[in-house]
Amino acid sequence: MSLRVFWFLFVILIAWTGPVTAAPLRIAYSAISGAMSTLWVAQEGGYFKREGLDTELLYIGGGTLLIQSMLSGDVPFAYGPSVPVINATLRGSDLVLIGNTGNSLVFSIMSRPEIKQPAQLRGKKVGVTRLGGSTDWALDAALKQWGMERSQISVIQTGGMPEGLAGLTAGALDAVVLSPPSNFRAAKAGMHELEDVGQLKIVFPNTPLSTTRSFLRANRDTSLRFMRGFTQGLQRLRTDKEFSMKVLSKYTKVTDSETLAQLYQTYGVRYSGDRIPYVRPESIDEILRRTPGKEAREAKAADFIDNSLLQELDKSGWFKTLGR
């Protein structure tokens, strides 16, 4: 083949295949819950795109799969799980928490209509999404409040909020730990709220952002742009009820205005977190205190936190400009 023919065919091939485009930045979230509202609003409001990022949101239910996705490099950022990230870090992974929008266990213990008192749960089946996850912690907090032992009930893994709600309404579960809007749906179906765990005022990193330290080091600029987009979403959530309710409806499939208003009140007002969504060290201390093993006893909250993105944005005056 002559050199001229070779270059002609090469140019034709390039023109036929078209330009190579970068893969979107994948961001995973761990639940179909209003707790994910900041991320959803940031995406739907176009704030990541405004920062020059092409982003794709992925729902990955359950902390284990989400952790594996981050460690494999498939998903650079995740929103939702805290305990699985801390447990993985205790085992030597380089996962790290870089922000957090919820500092309370925003869950309700919902029971069958005939169960009106916690004592009636003895010997009954109670659902959590994952053993060791935030719903499991919420259940333990409620049991402590009630003066009950875990051994007095049977704890069942459901895998997700929709599955837990379905199990409760079908009678396969006697009670289940649910977050909004699933707890609101349960109440509309005639279920009973045994405990509003959020009212127990337990400091807990309910909806943290996480990544790997290696990604953060290698992609500092991308990480900063991601955090700018995310915090713009948080500001929009807090200040634009109408838009936020539309976004919540899209992702949760809730359509009635009353439930959407409750959902917004919960996550856009009551539990939207601190002005700057730092990870609070005391919230990590709470998890470490309740985690068995020598590694947890010897660990410090700082081992799991990197607030440097938010600190850099704060120092630059970023948060003073939001909302202007």
Map each language-model feature to its residues.
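Hydrophobic alpha-helix position signal
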Residues: 42, 48, 88, 143, ...
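Positively charged n-region of N-terminal signal peptides that target proteins for export
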Residues: 1-5
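Short amphipathic alpha-helical segments at helix boundaries and their inter-helical linkers
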Residues: 75, 79, 169, 267-281, ...
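Secondary-structure end/capping motifs
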Residues: 217-297
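Conserved C-terminal helix/tail region of periplasmic/extracytoplasmic solute-binding proteins
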Residues: 288-324
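Short, glycine-/small- and polar/acidic-enriched structural segments
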Residues: 23-170, 174-180, 193-197, 202-203
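Pocket-lining segment of extracytoplasmic ligand-binding domains
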Residues: 83-84, 162-252
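Bacterial N-terminal signal peptides
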Residues: 6-17
